[in-house]
Amino acid sequence: MTLKQIREILRQAQEHPSIKSIYFEGGEPFLYYPILLKGIQLASELGFETGIVSNGYWATTKEDALEWLRSLAKILDSISVSSDLFHYSEELSRQAQNAQNAARKLGISLDFISIAQPEDDSAEVGIGQLPEGFSGIKYQGRAADKLADCVEGQAWQSFTECPYEDLREPGRVHIDPFGHMHICQGISLGNIFETPINEICTEYNAKTHPITGMLLKGGPAKLVE
C-alpha cells in the first residue's frame, strides 16, 4: 500500500463520523517500516486512535525492540503482538517479551494475541475483542486450509450462522492494498478507490447483499444451497 493510497483512505475515513480508530495489520506491517511509520503519523495527526498488529519478529533484543518502537512513541496508541506455537517455538516468545518491555518504557499499550493449538478444545474463539490468554482457532484463510484436518469434521449443513462479525451493523472493516473494503476477510462491500467509503456504507444493506444476505438467512450452509 502506497502513501498516496493511505492518505486517500484517511481522507475518506475522516469524512465518516463513526470511524474513530485506524489499525495497520498484515501480513506483517513492520516489513514496510517507513510507510508504516508515516501512516501512523498521518492517522494520529488527524485525531484517530492508532494501532498495529505484528508478529514481533523485529524485537530480537530489548535494545533493538526499543529502537524499533521509539519513533512510534506518542503517535501509536496500542500494538498487538502475536505469540504462540504457530509463530514461535514457545508460547510466550522472547521477541514478544522484548516488545512488551520496550512498549512499557515508551508508554505504548501492548497486548498479546495467542491462538491455542487445534487439539485444545477448551479455548473459546474470540469475537471482537480477544480475551486474555489463548483464543480458539477461527478456521478461515490459511487456517481453513492448513489446520481443518487437525480436528473432527462437521457436516456442512451444521454451519447455519456467522457468529464472528456483526453483518448488520459492522463495527469495523478491513481495507486491503487494492482498496477492497471487507466486512469479513474475503467478503468485499466495494472498492473505496472507485466508490467512497461513505457511499459504500450508505448503500450497504445486509439483507439484500448477495453474500451477507445469505449468511444472515442461514450461514455458510445457505451459500452452498
Describe each model-derived feature in a short phrase.
Residues M1-G128:
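Conserved glycine-rich "GG(E/T)P / GGGxP" loop and the immediately following alpha-helix
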Residues Q129-F134:
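Active-site-proximal segments of metal-dependent phosphoesterases and phosphodiesterases across multiple
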Residues S135-E225:
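Accessory C-terminal segments flanking Radical SAM cores
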